[in-house]
UniProtKB/Swiss-Prot annotation:
Gene: MT-CYB
Primary location class: mitochondrion
Gene3D superfamilies: Cytochrome Bc1 Complex, Chain C
CDD domains: cytochrome_b_C, Cytochrome_b_N
SUPFAM superfamilies: a domain/subunit of cytochrome bc1 complex (Ubiquinol-cytochrome c reductase) (SSF81648), Transmembrane di-heme cytochromes (SSF81342)
GO BP terms in the entry: mitochondrial electron transport, ubiquinol to cytochrome c
Presence of the UniProt keyword Kinase in the record: no
Name of this protein: Cytochrome b
Organism listed in the record: Herpestes naso
Record localization: Mitochondrion inner membrane
Cofactor annotation comment: Binds 2 heme b groups non-covalently.
Family that this chain belongs to: Belongs to the cytochrome b family.
GO molecular function: metal ion binding; ubiquinol-cytochrome-c reductase activity
Keyword Membrane part of the UniProt annotation: yes
Length: 379
């Protein structure tokens, strides 16, 4: 009799994805982030579901319903802070996962990479809409500022913004639709993640050396299940440390003030994980130019595979490209810092310099370094 694990139509899919999956024997801890993202997504959906049971998406009661969750609902405070800080952890894992893909040349799996970019956009949209829901000062003003950017689109901009708002300003209609979208998008993300995995399993995983590992595969279970569980325990420990010791560390104090359309906060800024893109947006004095730069800062990932000039896949044996990669990481950290600073000297100049460097590294310097390394290997 055949093992049910291998014959049952449903269990067979799980078996081929997580148990008998042939995996390269040399993949490092950088390959843990895929499973961590899956856990983050499940955690966010579950905590979000319980929050939605007590939340009301009405401008008059949204803020007080969040306060009610934290004060009166059994363990409501821990659910709320796990959801808020879980989002931060989600983005840390996302950035590391995408960074791993860039470093080791995983972007040569074009379908997987492009679905990944689509996932990044969807997660960013979900997080943005979730930030609006508590209806604090920063929720309201960030929603106003970010949605207003669409008015820079020629001809249809103003109509588009009013259509998204459901009126002439961010109000009850906006909050209600943002809640609806924030609820549905994680399920769309789950479907996209399944497609992401489907395309990945068509080709098999990449590995640090960038060389085909077909001759040296090991089963996913028990080797990588154990490895993933270790990563998961570390992540949960970080999350719970954050939630139980300093839950508001990554939040904004302004969001503890109920939304007031008549009072603008001195510094409007999004959550920390959007600051790099926000800094790029602010570094261009022209509105349309800033919006284009903002969109391109993420969409540029789609052309990374087309700019690959090296004869080697990953950067493991490419010291020049490694230097550029870590310069890019440092540049993104600089942009994140600048995004949280006021618009004044010297932050404006630093932001503009960091923005130019960001695009230069990806579009110009990395392809050049690949070509130089090819030449060096010939000599």
């Amino acid at each position: 009799m055949t093992n049910i694990r291998k014959s049952h139509p449903l269990i067979k899919i799980v078996n081929e994805s997580f148990i008998d999956l042939p995996a390269p024997s040399n993949i490092s801890a950088w390959w843990n982030f895929g499973s961590l993202l899956g856990v983050c997504l499940i955690l966010q959906i579950l905590t979000g579901l319980f929050l939605a049971m007590h939340y009301t998406s009405d401008t008059a009661t949204a803020f007080s319903s969040v306060t009610h969750i934290c004060r009166d609902v059994n363990y409501g405070w821990i659910i709320r802070y796990m959801h808020a800080n879980g989002a931060s952890l989600f983005f840390i894992c996302l950035f590391m996962h995408a960074g791993r893909g860039m470093y080791y040349g995983s972007y040569t799996f074009m379908e997987t990479w492009n679905i990944g970019i689509l996932l990044l956009f969807t997660v960013m949209a979900t997080a943005f809409m979730g930030y609006v829901l508590p209806w604090g000062q920063m929720s309201f003003w960030x929603a106003t500022v970010i949605t207003n950017l669409l008015s820079a689109i020629p001809y249809i901009g103003t109509n588009l913004v009013e259509w998204i708002w459901g009126g002439f300003s961010v109000d009850k209609a906006t909050l209600t639709r943002f809640f609806a979208f924030h609820f549905i998008l994680p399920f769309i993300i789950s479907a996209l993640a399944a497609v992401h995995l489907l395309f990945l399993h068509e080709t098999g995983s990449n590995n640090p050396s960038g060389v085909s590992s077909d001759s040296d595969k090991i089963p996913f279970h028990p080797y990588y299940t154990i490895k993933d569980i270790l990563g998961l325990l570390i992540m949960l420990m970080v999350l719970m440390t954050l939630v139980l010791f300093s839950p508001d560390l990554l939040g904004d104090p302004d969001n503890y003030t109920p939304a007031n359309p008549l009072n603008t906060p001195p510094h409007i800024k999004p959550e920390w994980y959007f600051l790099f893109a926000y800094a790029i947006l602010r570094s261009i004095p022209n509105k349309l130019g800033g919006v284009l730069a903002l969109a391109l800062s993420i969409m540029i990932l789609a052309i990374v595979p087309l700019l690959h000039t090296s004869n080697q896949r990953g950067m493991m044996f490419r010291p020049l490209s490694q230097c550029l990669f870590w310069l890019l990481v440092a540049d993104l950290l600089t942009l994140t810092w600048i995004g949280g600073q006021p618009v004044e000297h010297p932050f404006i100049a630093i932001g503009q310099l960091a923005s130019v460097l960001y695009f230069s590294i990806i579009l110009v310097l990395m392809p050049i370094s690949g070509t130089i390394e090819n030449q060096l290997l010939k000599w």
